[in-house]
């Protein structure tokens, strides 16, 4: 992958040997990062198009950035389309149409590997799992949680883990509030519980009408035998099912379908996805694919479908509001990705399905309007940030750093990432820090340090972590981050914001000099009395300055800083909690791996061990009365 030619000259040189068959080509920039992936029925013809004169600005910009080019021959155009989709997903090239938010949808899982099956929320692949039944997908975790709550009210199946289930010797709160039949202490037998499992399965599969009819017959039978209390309970279940059915929006038009509506405004696109499973509306979610240059809705929808169904579960049919480019090839590629033989993608003209598509289109337009308002506001803020910090361009990626610790213990550093479209949580990073690492080998770099930082070094050039461990920890974070950026230059931030003061400026400058990097950065410290709105900004070669607390850009910077701070505290607490839980049991004389495992298995959790009485502790195999007293005393002291 080496060549002295670039741009159109490079493409001309590659045309000599380019084959006239189907395949995929990749364009790379000067850093050998993939910037575009394309497929072609005829590679030679497609590459020839890139040396024509009448190209749009996006294509011209892409060609100008191309320093290396590779192509792969495939057996058919469908294979080329499939390979193209996989490479786009893997490399996320900036000149391709991209589906940024591709996290998997959550499901409801009914576990079948236990005598008393558990209902729970599940996120991940379901095709290869055989330990349960899966219902969904749902558009959000909120939709799953709401449905699970309703199911618990109606059917009262357990939701606890096996460890918690096995540790019970009395009913938990779920039983008291009538959301569980407490099978853990045999308040219900296996046969009756199995009947409830059949009922909840029927409901989640959409057989609500048949279920209600069967329950009505059972209610009448119980009444005729004068089991009025049991009959009343089934009556309440029928009423609850009717209410949930009404609220869920059961559809007779579609049973198992994804409805997709694409709309466009000012070069921005929204694809609204409405999920229907077992005739029930499982929620809607808007996507905003990124696309550079001139594109069509047909092309956007094509790449959206290919990327979306690499991860999401396929329904029986996909209903769309717009034609799809290369529709037949797209169908074949999706079938191969999902290893199926049949797939329907339909564009309804009239009837019930057309009305559902129209509703989805209306929702898509509303979602796009809201997105554009937020996008415009973010653009204004980004322009202000560019001018405020003398950046060469409007920032695309801002990285915000903070750390959290207690006197150097349980230390973590974090990186939060934001851009034009808001926070990018997939790019968040956590750095586990060692408070014992000293900064050696930097003695030659200390001469130009800020005096505030320089005083933290001793005469041997070793960093004094007991005085300024916050500097030491941030230096660890930045060193690790810049090391990674050397490997991933395409993720270089436009700006770094550090939660720190003048001393941090010196640390950042020295570490960047060591790596021969020059990333714009600013340190943001709390003002007098740590009051919000009085923050101070520290930059190399500039006097410390503040901003009017009412300026939108100031409020935005506070939001960025607070997001990093919250993320740091959250991860610090998690680490501290894990360490404390581990050490509290491990430090008790007589508690080894086996007894600790027995305690956690019996009680189900560390909290349950802490809550246990001495009499409850001695019930655990291997725990004597004296050891139980020691455990109780130690845990309650800690």
UniProtKB/Swiss-Prot annotation:
The UvrABC repair system catalyzes the recognition and processing of DNA lesions. UvrC both incises the 5' and 3' sides of the lesion. The N-terminal half is responsible for the 3' incision and the C-terminal half is responsible for the 5' incision. HAMAP family: UvrC (MF_00203). GO terms for cellular component: cytoplasm; excinuclease repair complex. Residues 20-97 form the GIY-YIG domain. It is found in: Cytoplasm. Residues 209-244 form the UVR domain. The gene is uvrC. The keyword Cytoplasm applies. GO terms for molecular function: DNA binding; excinuclease ABC activity. Pfam families: GIY-YIG (PF01541), HHH_5 (PF14520), UVR (PF02151), UvrC_RNaseH (PF22920), UvrC_RNaseH_dom (PF08459). Keywords: Cytoplasm, DNA damage, DNA excision, DNA repair, Excision nuclease, SOS response. One of its GO terms (biological process) is SOS response. Interacts with UvrB in an incision complex. This is UvrABC system protein C. Belongs to the UvrC family. PROSITE patterns: GIY_YIG, UVR, UVRC. Its main location: cytoplasm.
């Amino acid at each position: 992958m080496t060549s002295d030619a670039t741009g159109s000259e490079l493409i001309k040189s590659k045309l000599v040997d380019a084959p006239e068959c189907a395949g995929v080509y990749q364009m790379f920039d000067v850093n050998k990062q993939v910037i575009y992936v394309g497929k072609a029925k005829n590679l030679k013809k497609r590459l020839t198009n890139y040396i024509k004169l009448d190209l749009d600005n996006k294509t011209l910009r892409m060609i100008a950035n191309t320093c290396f080019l590779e192509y792969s021959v495939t057996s058919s155009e469908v294979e080329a389309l499939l390979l193209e989709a996989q490479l786009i997903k893997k490399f996320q090239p900036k000149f391709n149409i991209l589906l940024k938010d591709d996290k998997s949808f959550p499901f409801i899982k009914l576990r079948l590997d236990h005598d008393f099956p558990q209902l729970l929320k599940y996120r991940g692949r379901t095709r290869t799992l055989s330990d349960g039944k899966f219902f969904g997908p749902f558009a959000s975790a909120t939709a799953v949680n709401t449905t699970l709550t309703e199911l618990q009210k109606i059917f009262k199946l357990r939701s606890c883990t096996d460890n918690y289930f096995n540790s019970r010797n009395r009913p938990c709160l779920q039983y008291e509030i009538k959301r569980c039949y407490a099978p853990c202490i045999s308040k219900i037998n296996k046969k009756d519980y199995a009947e409830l499992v059949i009922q909840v399965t029927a409901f989640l599969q959409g057989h609500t009408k048949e279920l209600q009819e069967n329950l009505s017959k059972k209610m009448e039978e119980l009444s005729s035998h004068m089991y009025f209390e049991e009959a009343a309970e089934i009556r309440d279940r029928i009423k609850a099912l009717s209410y949930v059915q009404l609220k869920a929006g059961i559809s007779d038009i579609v049973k198992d379908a994804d409805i997709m509506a694409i709309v466009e405004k000012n070069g921005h696109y929204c694809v609204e996805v409405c999920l229907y499973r077992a005739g029930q509306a499982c929620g809607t979610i808007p996507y905003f694919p990124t696309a550079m240059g001139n594109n069509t809705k047909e092309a956007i929808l094509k790449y959206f479908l290919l990327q979306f169904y690499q991860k999401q579960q396929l329904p029986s049919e996909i209903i769309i509001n717009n034609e799809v480019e290369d529709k037949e090839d797209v169908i074949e590629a999706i079938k191969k990705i999902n290893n199926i033989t049949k797939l329907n993608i339909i564009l309804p003209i009239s009837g019930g399905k057309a009305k559902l598509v129209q509703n989805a289109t209306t929702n898509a337009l509303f979602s796009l309007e809201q997105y554009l308002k937020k996008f415009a506001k973010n653009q204004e803020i980004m322009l202000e940030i560019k001018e405020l910090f003398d950046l060469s361009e409007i920032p695309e990626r801002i990285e915000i750093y903070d750390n959290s610790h207690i006197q150097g213990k349980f230390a973590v550093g974090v990186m939060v990432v934001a851009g034009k479209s808001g926070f990018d949580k997939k790019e968040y990073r956590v750095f586990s820090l060692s408070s014992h690492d000293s900064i050696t080998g930097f003695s030659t770099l200390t001469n130009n340090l800020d005096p505030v930082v320089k005083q933290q070094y001793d005469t041997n050039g070793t960093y004094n972590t007991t005085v300024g461990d916050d500097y030491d920890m941030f230096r660890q974070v930045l060193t690790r981050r810049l090391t990674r950026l050397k490997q991933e230059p395409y993720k270089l931030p436009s700006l770094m914001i550090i939660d720190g003061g003048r001393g941090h400026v010196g640390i950042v400058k020295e570490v960047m000099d060591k790596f021969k990097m020059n990333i714009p950065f600013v340190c943001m410290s709390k003002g007098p009395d740590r009051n919000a709105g009085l923050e101070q900004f520290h930059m190399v070669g500039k006097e410390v300055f503040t901003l009017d607390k009412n300026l939108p850009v100031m409020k935005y910077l506070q939001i960025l800083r607070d997001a990093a701070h919250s993320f740091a505290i959250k991860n610090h607490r998690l680490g501290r909690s894990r360490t404390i839980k581990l050490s509290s049991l491990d430090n008790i004389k007589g508690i080894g791996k086996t007894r600790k495992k027995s305690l956690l298995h019996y009680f189900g959790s560390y909290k349950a061990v802490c809550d246990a009485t001495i009499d409850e502790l001695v019930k655990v195999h291997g725990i004597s009365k004296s050891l139980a007293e020691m455990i109780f005393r130690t845990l309650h002291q800690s």
